[in-house]
Curated annotation (Swiss-Prot):
This is G-protein coupled receptor dmsr-1. It comes from Caenorhabditis elegans. It holds the Pfam family 7TM_GPCR_Srw. The gene is dmsr-1. Residues 1-35, 86-107, 177-223, 329-343 are extracellular. InterPro entries: 7TM_GPCR_serpentine_rcpt_Srw (IPR019427), GPCR_1 (IPR053219), GPCR_Rhodpsn (IPR000276), GPCR_Rhodpsn_7TM (IPR017452). Keywords: Cell membrane, G-protein coupled receptor, Glycoprotein, Membrane, Receptor, Transducer, Transmembrane, Transmembrane helix. The chain crosses the membrane at residues 36-56, 65-85, 108-128, 156-176, 224-244, 308-328, 344-364. The lineage of its organism: Eukaryota, Metazoa, Ecdysozoa, Nematoda, Chromadorea. G-protein coupled receptor. GO terms for molecular function: G protein-coupled peptide receptor activity; neuropeptide receptor activity. It is a multi-pass membrane protein. Belongs to the G-protein coupled receptor 1 family.
Length: 510
């Protein structure tokens, strides 16, 4: 395709330089393996992004951020699959077997469609990463502020639709750039059968409308592709990375200040319920369960933001060199395109492929919820049951803390709950238990639903009933939302048949 007549030169480069020889050496070293590596990354990335789409669209995973990540995975899948067909055909078929059917009009149409589709999908993915950083910034800024903006699923759907639509509209000048030219096959292939010497070959070229008016359409599409699709999103990504890092620092400082203040609170709390005095002390209050503690919530915020920062950083690292090269290619003389851009084009293409493949690795390494959902979707139920049967395996989302509960029953003779010899009476119940972040289920149906095991795929180590006394019904006037642990506390009253050993056995069965 002819670019010289539509080129604008601001910087003139020398005709010869030792750097040109270095770039040529890099090209000669990497180009023979580029096609194989590209196909491998395309196949791997297509499978990985398909897994991302399946997992992130599950009902339990539908959040505004995950919906944007799903749209990014869809765009990356389109880019990788289109690039897979292009690389396979033109690297291993068209140039190797110079037959007219491999250079037909249909393949020329595919080449133009591949150029447009890859540009729109890849640019949409880049701008969606900017939208992702913006959504996370707004979410963190409005956290704890009742009057702040709350990002919902509907907002994420609108953001995805608007982003993709605007990218497609801005790419409209690029749609007018190309036409299909017919030329002899011997001008395309060097190793050609003499019988196909004058056979037609169809290739894309610059359209006449793009060259009209001093190449107005071509220049417009070129600068839109370089500035709007490369440089501008990279600048915004850099800004949001800085803002998110600043928010992380503020959150960390606030959490440390709150934890420091919480250390001055009394460690033991005593409450009264139904004539009983309950004393509860929590060990290790500085690091409680991940689902309910202050530090756990802060760590979840940090992990989510760090994961999104990793995604944005990968996008920034892979896109910034391409943006710089695209701008310089439009500003420098023809020597830049011949000796630098063309020789480094394969490496820039490799950066794009790596950026499209890294999301799955980031999710699996930094998101426990994604790993659990991926394990539940793609791992068979029998394997899950065998995994849960191991006593040393605990769900990573379970809260874990050591809680000491002491049941002190007032004594009619002396109100201190002790006998005359200074020891507690026989009716005094004291138990030290380990609370795991699950509540006692009233029947085995809840356990079956939680573990995914049923009569077809049973989990033998999981008990289907508990040997201790049944839980008492909720009395009238009590809060229906009272958890099962509260009923266990009530079972230590005078009319209860449960003993301290029964309570211990109850929690041991959990």
């Amino acid at each position: 395709m002819e670019f010289t007549e539509c080129k604008t030169t601001f910087i003139h480069l020398p005709d010869k330089s030792f750097l040109y020889d270095v770039f040529v050496s890099v090209y000669n070293f990497y180009h023979p393996i580029h096609a194989y590596l590209s196909i491998f990354l395309c196949v791997l990335g297509t499978i990985a992004n398909f897994c991302n789409i399946v997992v992130l669209t599950r009902r339990t995973m539908r959040t505004p951020v995950n919906m944007i990540l799903t749209a990014m995975a869809s765009c990356d899948t389109v880019v990788l699959f289109s690039n897979l067909i292009y690389t396979t055909h033109y690297s291993f078929v068209a140039f190797k077997f110079c037959h007219p059917k491999h250079w037909s009009y249909s393949w020329a149409l595919f080449l133009i469609a591949h150029a447009h589709l890859s540009l729109v999908a890849h640019s949409s993915s880049v701008w969606l990463s900017v939208m992702l950083a913006l959504v996370r910034y707004v979410t963190l800024r409005s956290r704890g502020n009742m009057g702040g903006m709350q990002v919902t699923l509907r907002h994420s759907y609108y953001a995805v639709a608007v982003t993709v639509s605007l990218v497609a509209v801005l790419n409209a000048p690029n749609f007018l750039n190309y036409k299909i030219n017919e030329q002899p096959l011997n001008e395309t292939c060097t190793d050609l059968d003499p019988m196909f010497w004058n056979s037609p070959a169809y290739l894309p070229g610059i359209a006449d409308i793009a060259k009209a008016n001093s190449c107005l359409v071509f220049r417009l599409s070129y600068w839109i592709s370089g500035m709007v699709f490369k440089v501008l999103p990279c600048a915004l990504l850099s800004l949001f990375v800085w803002l998110l890092l600043r928010i992380l620092r503020e959150v960390r400082e606030n959490r440390q200040r709150l934890l420091k203040n919480s250390q001055h609170r009394p460690p033991n709390q005593t409450t009264t319920r139904n004539g009983q005095r309950l004393s509860i002390s929590v060990a290790g209050n500085e690091k409680l369960g991940r689902n309910g503690s202050l530090r756990g919530r802060g760590e979840r915020v940090d992990r989510t933001t760090h994961m999104l920062l990793a995604i944005v950083a990968v996008m920034l690292v892979t896109e910034l060199p391409q943006g710089i090269m695209a701008v310089l290619s439009g500003m420098c003389s023809e020597e830049f395109r011949i000796y630098i851009y063309n020789n480094l084009g394969d490496i820039l293409d490799l950066f794009s492929l790596c950026g499209s493949c890294c999301s799955f690795i980031i999710y699996c390494s930094m998101s426990g919820q994604f790993r659990n959902e991926f394990h539940r979707v793609f791992v068979p139920a029998k394997v899950r049951c065998l995994r849960m049967s191991s006593p040393s395996i605990r769900r990573p989302s379970d809260a874990y803390s050591t809680t000491k509960m002491t049941f002190l029953k007032p004594n009619e003779k002396n109100g201190n709950g002790m006998n005359g010899n200074g020891t507690y009476s026989e009716d005094t119940r004291s138990a030290s238990v380990k609370m795991v972040g699950i509540q006692v289920r009233r029947n085995s149906t809840e356990i079956t639903r939680m573990t995914g095991c049923d009569s077809i795929t049973p989990c033998s180590p999981m008990p289907t009933s508990f040997p201790s006394s049944p839980l008492p019904p909720i009395r009238s006037g009590e809060d229906e939302s009272t958890d099962e642990t509260s009923h266990l506390l009530n079972s230590s009253g005078p009319n209860s048949t449960a003993s301290a050993d029964g309570i211990r056995g109850h929690f041991q069965n959990i």
